[in-house]
Regions:
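Gly/Thr-rich phosphate-binding loop signature of adenosyl cofactor/nucleotide-binding cores
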Residues: 262
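N-terminal accessory segments that position/regulate proteins before the catalytic core
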Residues: 1-251, 256, 278-319
Length: 319
């Protein structure tokens, strides 16, 4: 019988112990002092009895716990199927997916949602007009969906006109109107009635906090993965997610969906106002973190909405 180290697990250190994590079956196994030599030996297929006699009890223990896998076994077939399907995404992606995959015996728990933490109380604050003050070009949902689907409200080409502060207030109020783990950071470049700079949106007060200076074309393009088209926008809204809603790593999946819902609402509101909006997740996280001033340990950069006036139009969303 030939054995090798499982391809669907990994090693981490915790509380002074070295632990093998089997993410397919959600099991952890503490590795003893002789395990290292055995694992290194079976890094490729080798005969079960090819190790010295003193290591054979370790081999049996590792095999019983699926740290070692027997060639042709059910576990081997399962791993081969996973590797075939997930190989191009690399080991980290499949490890996360299967580690957070729930089973019929999974138990769920939640925590009470705290107040938003990113309120920047010491920053200059600017109250925003309510959504009712903006000039809405489309009020029927079907009309808005038609405009978005036909490219009129979405795209990567923008007109010379900027965005009005009335339109900005309306979009942010619509997008941030529910309890969410998503934070919004508008980078204002050409918004009529608002100083250029980096802001944070306070959903409770419906106001902006000025947290950074004007962002030039080069810095914005670099943060957005060298996509030159973003420089034509009057407004870029970066989305971040706070890890607080759940005590399970599965919450990372939910953070992405949450930001997507917020962006879709903002995009539909933008289309209803006659604006053009686009979304990109091709961002350089590190540059975005520096640009908006967030801590990557607690606040994760997700992507951004890029917003501007329609081609051939003036300032959009005002009276």
């Amino acid at each position: 019988m030939r054995l090798r180290v499982s391809a669907c697990g990994g090693v981490f250190a915790t509380d002074g112990q070295v632990v093998w994590d089997d993410y397919l079956d959600h099991r952890q196994f503490v590795l003893g002092p002789d395990s290292d030599a055995v694992l290194r030996w079976f890094i490729r297929w080798r005969d079960r009895d090819s190790v010295p006699e003193r290591h054979r009890p370790v081999v049996e223990a590792l095999l019983a716990n699926d740290v070692l896998v027997a060639e042709g076994s059910q576990r081997d077939a399962q791993e081969q199927a996973v590797l075939h399907a997930w190989g191009r995404w690399g080991p980290v992606a499949r490890a996360y997916h299967y580690s957070t995959r729930t089973t019929r015996g999974s138990r769920f728990s939640g925590v009470e949602a705290p107040r938003p933490v990113g309120t920047f109380r010491d920053a200059e604050r600017i109250p925003l007009p309510g959504a009712e003050e903006a000039r809405w070009l489309h009020r029927d949902l079907l009309d808005v969906l038609r405009v978005r689907g036909g490219g009129g409200g979405g795209g990567r080409e923008f007109g010379d006109g900027g965005v009005s502060v009335l339109a900005l207030g309306a979009m942010l109020q619509a997008a941030g109107g529910s309890v969410s783990s998503t934070e919004l950071y508008p980078v204002v470049r050409d918004v009529d009635g608002l100083k250029p700079g980096v802001y944070h949106y306070d959903v409770q007060g419906h106001e902006l906090a000025l947290v950074g200076d004007f962002v030039g074309d080069a810095d914005l393009i670099a943060a957005c993965g060298d996509q030159a088209w973003v420089a034509g926008a009057g407004l870029v809204v970066f989305y971040t997610s706070l890890v607080w809603r759940h005590d399970s790593p599965r919450a990372y999946r939910v953070l992405q969906l949450d930001a997507g819902h917020v962006n879709q609402t903002l995009s539909l509101a933008g289309a209803a106002l006659g604006l053009r909006t686009a979304f990109t997740a091709a961002i350089r996280d590190e540059l975005v973190e520096e640009l908006i001033g967030c801590d990557p340990a607690t606040e994760l950069a997700i992507g951004c909405a890029v917003i501007g006036g329609a081609v051939g139009g003036g300032v959009v969303g005002g009276e």
